[in-house]
């Protein structure tokens, strides 16, 4: 319980959850775009970003786009066309089709499915890495055997159980689309995330491990797919002497100015990962003895990028907390706390945390969509079904978890104060 009598000095400047960290070369590449008048969606910066993405991640082709969401949209369109054929103009490539999706993620992972007319089916989370549960995925294929597309995200920079998921997806003849927006630079068995699907995406949003203020990349080893994405992203203009269009296109290309920032950031990716790892380790050490644990990782098979440090409170140490659609209330209890209380305490010293991603199956927009847990249909819950021990893992992690300030410019002294505030919540 965080007592009102606790007096912790507020930070003069806010400690952010995860803000951009600039180094200097970024502005030089932006100036280069300005001074050479390449203030468009073509130019050297874009070419360099695509080259650097391929070189670092280990894929054959990269297409720089305006956002990770744009990249994922075109990946879903490609997957839909491959699985079900080219749709008529005005119809989505996934129209009327189910797509298996990570449940505990940001809605940008899922919305592109709907852009193409698909119906997301949410697959529950596992406790080992907080990612898609392979057991639940197999159960989903039993329930919906005709599904041909699966989109998997790696939460907070920690790769999921890639081999298990891929084996199930391949067994059922489906296509994997990998959302590596949060996990750029993370590896699974020595291989970079963003290479495991047929179509893959990364993000350069302002809070990511490296940034362009915006932007993303579509990644693949399929040259035809890369060319198709490049064409679609420039309004699907044909190679004709006039403006001719035979397919639906989009204005999704990355700006050469934004690309200048990304180009300047790329050489610092490993440095950023090392800084994020140090933050995670300091939290892990500093919170020892409290009834909490950090976000889990499979360090035998993966090297996360430690994008965000998170904690989850032990069940017996949770005070009473009730969340509505937009409001929350809790009861202070000695020796116990909850995510809401900790976030309020952190905010009181001018630091930013946030709740864990609210699972997609709990979101109002998707509350009628199918949801699959290890034991089957997660929506069909009678009292007997619940008493049988069916677990909604994503809901549990959301209820007990939170993201801690993870800005790589945060000083050790600032982090120590945040740790002391968290400790005070359990007094």
Task: List each model region and its residues.
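N-terminal "arm"/small-domain region of PLP-dependent enzymes with the aminotransferase-like
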Residues: 1-39, 405
């Amino acid at each position: 319980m965080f007592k009102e009598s606790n007096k912790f000095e507020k930070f003069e400047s806010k400690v952010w959850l995860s803000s951009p960290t600039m180094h200097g070369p970024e502005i030089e590449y932006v100036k280069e775009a300005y001074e050479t008048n390449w203030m468009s969606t073509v130019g050297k910066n874009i070419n360099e970003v695509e080259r650097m993405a391929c070189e670092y991640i280990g894929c054959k082709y990269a297409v720089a786009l305006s956002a990770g969401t744009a990249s994922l949209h075109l990946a879903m369109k490609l997957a839909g066309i491959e699985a079900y054929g080219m749709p008529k103009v005005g119809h989505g490539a996934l129209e009327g089709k189910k797509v298996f999706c990570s449940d505990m993620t940001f809605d940008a992972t899922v919305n592109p499915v709907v852009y193409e007319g698909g119906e997301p089916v949410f697959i529950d989370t596992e406790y080992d890495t907080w990612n898609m549960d392979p057991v639940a995925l197999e159960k989903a294929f039993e329930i919906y055997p005709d599904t041909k597309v699966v989109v998997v995200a790696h939460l907070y920079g920690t790769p999921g159980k890639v081999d298990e998921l891929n084996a199930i997806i391949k067994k059922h003849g489906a296509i994997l689309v990998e959302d590596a927006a949060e996990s750029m630079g993370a590896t699974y068995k020595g291989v970079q995330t963003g290479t495991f699907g047929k179509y893959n995406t990364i993000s350069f949003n302002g809070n990511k491990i490296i940034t362009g203020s915006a932007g993303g990349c579509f990644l693949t080893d399929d040259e035809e797919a890369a060319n198709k994405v490049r064409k679609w992203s420039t309004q699907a203009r044909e190679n004709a002497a006039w403006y001719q269009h035979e397919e639906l296109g989009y204005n999704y290309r990355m700006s050469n100015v934004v690309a200048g920032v990304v180009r300047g950031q790329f050489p610092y990716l490993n440095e950023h990962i090392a800084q994020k790892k140090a933050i995670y380790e300091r939290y892990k050490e500093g919170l020892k003895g409290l009834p909490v644990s950090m976000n889990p990782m499979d360090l035998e098979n993966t090297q996360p990028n430690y994008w965000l440090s998170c904690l989850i409170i032990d069940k017996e140490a949770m005070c009473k907390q009730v969340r509505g659609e937009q409001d929350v209330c809790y009861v202070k209890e000695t020796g116990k706390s909850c995510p809401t209380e900790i976030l309020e305490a952190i905010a009181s010293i001018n630091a930013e945390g946030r709740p864990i991603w609210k699972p997609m199956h709990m979101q109002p927009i998707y509350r009628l969509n199918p949801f699959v847990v290890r034991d089957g249909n997660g929506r069909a819950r009678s009292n007997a079904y619940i008493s049988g021990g069916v677990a909604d893992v994503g809901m549990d992690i959301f209820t007990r978890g939170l993201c801690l300030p993870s800005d790589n410019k945060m000083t050790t002294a600032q982090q120590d104060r945040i740790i002391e505030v968290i400790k005070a919540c359990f007094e």
